[in-house]
């Protein structure tokens, strides 16, 4: 996705510790046209797979996930990082550690919304170590559903996440692959190569 890659290069802010801040279009302020293109790209990858549900984790995965679900014309389900008092039914649950926040969250989805009949695409805003996507995959497995693939908006290719997902047998589609975050600069995979 050339437009996404351009936005990451132009508007992304590199923070010490291998963190990329993209709050101007993805995880604080959202560019809906860009998120629509993200959803459309993921839809085109999995459109013949009988998708019945799009799954993400709150909060930054919701925008790309809902646009993906819109294209599929299926529900978007997001795992909650805390159990609200209104969630009184049985849930699937797992623990997910956030690389960026260095915090572990106990996440849940209602058993009413995820079943063995579902064919799921998992969406996440970032892929670093793969914890969020693997945690969501764990929820899919608990339900007996099928995970058709994982759509990632921004992948930090210099970290182990993608390999961990591939090792788990998952199909991974990354729309913007980052090779390095050095000296305040974003380097994309394939940049500078002949």
Swiss-Prot record:
Localization: Cytoplasm
Signal peptide residue numbers: none
Gene Ontology biological process terms from the UniProt entry: purine ribonucleoside salvage; xanthine metabolic process; XMP salvage
EC number: 2.4.2.22
Pathway entry: Purine metabolism; XMP biosynthesis via salvage pathway; XMP from xanthine: step 1/1
Residues reported to bind xanthine: 20, 27, 156
Entry-linked CDD domains: PRTases_typeI (cd06223)
Keywords: Cytoplasm, Glycosyltransferase, Purine salvage, Transferase
GO cellular component: cytoplasm
Main location, first listed in the record: cytoplasm
Binding site for 5-phospho-alpha-D-ribose 1-diphosphate: 128-132
UniProt GO MF annotations: xanthine phosphoribosyltransferase activity
SUPFAM superfamilies recorded: PRTase-like
Reaction catalyzed: XMP + diphosphate = xanthine + 5-phospho-alpha-D-ribose 1-diphosphate
InterPro entries: PRibTrfase_dom, PRTase-like, Pur/Pyrimidine_PRTase, Xanthine_PRibTrfase
UniProt function note: Converts the preformed base xanthine, a product of nucleic acid breakdown, to xanthosine 5'-monophosphate (XMP), so it can be reused for RNA or DNA synthesis.
Assembly, per entry: Homodimer.
Family listed: Belongs to the purine/pyrimidine phosphoribosyltransferase family. Xpt subfamily.
Protein name (record): Xanthine phosphoribosyltransferase
Organism from which the protein derives: Macrococcus caseolyticus (strain JCSC5402)
